[in-house]
Swiss-Prot record:
GO terms for cellular component: autophagosome membrane; cytoplasmic vesicle. GO terms for molecular function: phosphatidylinositol-3-phosphate binding; phosphatidylinositol-4-phosphate binding; phosphatidylinositol-5-phosphate binding. Keywords: Acetylation, Autophagy, Cytoplasmic vesicle, Lipid metabolism, Lipid-binding, Membrane, Phosphoprotein. This is Protein associated with UVRAG as autophagy enhancer. PANTHER family: PHOX (PX) DOMAIN-CONTAINING PROTEIN, PROTEIN ASSOCIATED WITH UVRAG AS AUTOPHAGY ENHANCER. It comes from Mus musculus (Mouse). Residues 131-173 are annotated as: Disordered.
Length: 648
């Protein structure tokens, strides 16, 4: 592996004492690796305060650069001692154990003086080399030396240090390390910033590896032990989320998914381990979504019988007169009930007493459980209530205009077949007294469908003008609130007698008739825009049609709020008609008395309209048998019939 380091010319000079020692080959074990060689890209910058003492105290020595096969020495120069910048002396060199030992031994054996002068750059050359390094490729600057340096260097095939005087080497090296301050061996801020991405990459990689290690442990459920696995093989059933992996020597592990419920596991003396299979888990979830009822191969015939009965019931249901929604609800209900009851056979825990028993006992228990489940499913289906059946019908949104006669609770519940009228829940006879009566529907509801809400009953208002509030079910409360402001009550038919019982309603009826006729007249006048805006104070159905009211209109009439408002609108309309020439020109003249006073249809107190020709006359003058306008219409029709046709 290749690591990056700097030339020995840039490193601090070790102050060594003693006689000069030549470099020679030796088999002595390598010395301790220098800490500076352990870094990926190390560089040392001596502060200015240390450079001057180094020029005076440090001896001259060659700069050593080693590779796998050779070591490069920088020849000396008689220039002033100076420390080269780390930017100009960076060099790439492959490190190995031998070369690292050689470099360490060389640094320990070095001495000054008699070996020769070293190549040292002056401060001016330092600045010049730094400027040139900015213009060059960093990789080129780091790997290729300058021509001058190349000419001054010589290569030697092998460079080793002698093994003598080990104590002297250690003492000189410790003296050299203690001489420099701690700031000398600290990396500058620029180098730390350059190496910041290495630290970030290491942190990210460690976090990702921890997540990969913890993720399978979180997803994998609790495994069964070997004893539970053997019990599971005895029962002949398999859990879908696990696979059996047989580990045999000399053979690859083979897996059996177990998605097929009828497949029996092979028992072998080789130890088997249970492992989680994501493919099998997805297949099992897919099967559960499709409502797989039973996966025991031994009960295929029973399952087929259940499917046949289910298909027959399905066809019978579809042939009935139920709505598509009701038919679908019934089919889904039956399918869910059958799936829920039959799935209990497959959901037996491996550590239960049933699975721990013999295989024959398990089969008998499964058969009994299956039969009881089928019977229970049939019983639930028979007792279940689905909207549209004969014994229970869901309440419908309808307006009931008749008052229900009083009836005993027991008789009413029997008429409901002991079912709640709202949800169809079966009611036992001992709980009949807990049911609540709905005055609107005239039926009994359970506590979940009847929260004792109160509302006015439309039938009691139309028949007895009764605005008292009675308890109704939640469904009836919602229905009455939804139609409270809708004009759905017409009093012209069977409830016309209500005008005689409610005098205030009769006055509202008269005002409504006048406003109905005068509004038609005002719509034809182009000067009646301001008056028509007054009609917006009341609902439009009160002035567009007669004898049509809503529940809110009845209540406001009962409180005396509607009649004064209608009178104000009528007063403003009459004032406009009296002063408007266009409206006066659209009035009538009584043909019986030949009076010049203009009369209008909205004057219901003094005028009357002919039912045939819709002409307006005074009440005391009008005679239906002698209507002059009807007589003219009949005479004109007879005259047209007596005229000869164009063909004759």
């Amino acid at each position: 592996m290749v690591s990056q380091s700097i030339g020995w010319g840039d490193s601090p000079v070790d102050l060594c004492e003693g006689s000069n020692r030549a470099f020679q080959d030796t088999d002595q074990p390598a010395c301790q690796l220098d800490v500076r060689l352990l870094r990926h890209k190390a560089s040392w910058i001596n502060p200015l305060c240390v450079q001057q003492p180094l020029q005076e105290l440090c001896p001259q020595r060659p700069t050593v650069q080693s590779s796998e096969n050779h070591v490069v020495l920088d020849t000396p120069s008689p220039l002033r001692l100076s420390i080269l910048s780390y930017r100009d002396s960076l060099a790439e060199m492959p490190l190995s154990e031998n070369t690292a030992d050689v470099i360490c031994s060389n640094s320990a054996h070095c001495s000054g003086g008699k070996e020769g002068d070293f190549f040292l750059a002056t401060e001016e050359q330092e600045v010049h080399l730094q400027q040139e390094s900015l213009l060059k490729n960093p990789k080129t600057v780091a790997t290729s030396p300058s021509p001058k340096e190349g000419s001054a260097r010589s290569e030697s095939p092998h460079l080793t240090a002698s093994t003598d005087d080990g104590d002297a080497r250690s003492s000189s090296r410790s003296h050299a390390w203690n001489f420099f301050p701690l700031e000398t061996f600290m990396l500058p801020a620029d180098v730390e910033k350059e190496n910041l991405h290495f630290y970030a990459a290491d942190i990210i990689i460690s976090v990702i590896e921890n997540m990969k290690c913890n993720l399978p442990n979180q997803q994998q459920p609790e495994r069964w032990d070997t004893e539970d696995a053997s019990r599971l093989r005895g029962t002949g059933a398999e859990m879908t989320f696990y696979t059996h992996i047989k580990q045999e020597p000399g053979s690859s592990a083979s897996s059996h998914t177990g998605c097929e419920g009828c497949a029996a596991l092979q028992v072998s003396p080789v130890a088997e381990t249970l492992s989680y299979c994501p493919v099998a888990g997805e297949a099992c979830k897919h099967d559960l979504n499709k409502l797989v009822m039973l996966e025991l191969g031994k009960y295929n015939d029973i399952t087929k019988g259940c499917r046949c009965s289910y298909n027959s019931s399905k066809s019978a249901t579809c042939e009935s007169n139920l709505s598509p929604a009701g038919c679908l609800a019934r089919e889904l209900f039956r399918g869910f009930c059958k799936c829920w009851m039959l799935s209990e056979v497959n959901c037996q825990l491996p550590g239960s007493p049933t699975t721990a028993s013999s295989g024959v006992g398990d089969e008998e228990y499964a058969e009994e459980d299956f039969d009881s489940s089928v019977d229970a499913a049939r019983e639930v289906m028979l007792k279940s209530r689905v909207p549209g059946t004969e014994d229970w019908v869901l309440p419908r949104c309808q307006i009931i205009l008749t008052v229900h006669p009083p009836i005993k609770r027991d008789i009413a519940v029997v008429a409901q077949n002991f079912f709640c009228a709202g949800c169809g829940t079966p009611i036992q006879p001992k709980f009949v007294k807990r049911l609540r009566y709905c005055e609107y529907l005239g039926k009994y509801f359970c506590a979940s469908c009847h929260s004792s809400a109160e509302s006015c009953i439309p039938a009691r208002i139309l028949t007895m003008w009764d605005f008292r509030k009675y308890q109704v079910s939640d469904f009836s409360k919602w229905l009455l609130d939804s139609v409270w402001h809708q004009p759905v009550f017409k009093l012209l038919g069977g409830h016309h007698s209500l005008y005689a019982k409610a005098k205030e309603l009769d006055r509202v009826k008269d005002l409504q008739e006048q406003l109905f006729h005068i509004k038609k007249l005002l719509k034809t006048c182009r000067f009646a825009d301001s008056v028509l805006k007054e009609f917006e104070q009341v609902p439009s159905h009160l002035t567009d049609e007669c004898h049509i009211f809503s529940m809110d209109d009845f209540l406001r009439t009962k409180k005396g709020l509607l009649a004064p408002l209608l009178k104000d609108i009528l007063r403003a309309s009459l004032a406009h008609v009296d002063s408007c020439e266009l409206c006066q020109g659209k009035g009538f003249i009584c043909e019986f008395c030949q009076s010049t006073t203009v009369i209008f249809p909205f004057q219901t107190t003094t005028c009357r309209r002919c039912a045939a020709c819709r002409a307006c006359f005074h009440k005391q003058c009008f005679q239906s048998s002698r209507c002059p306008r009807c007589a003219r219409i009949i005479a004109r029709r007879q005259h047209l019939e007596s005229l000869p046709t164009a063909a004759t």
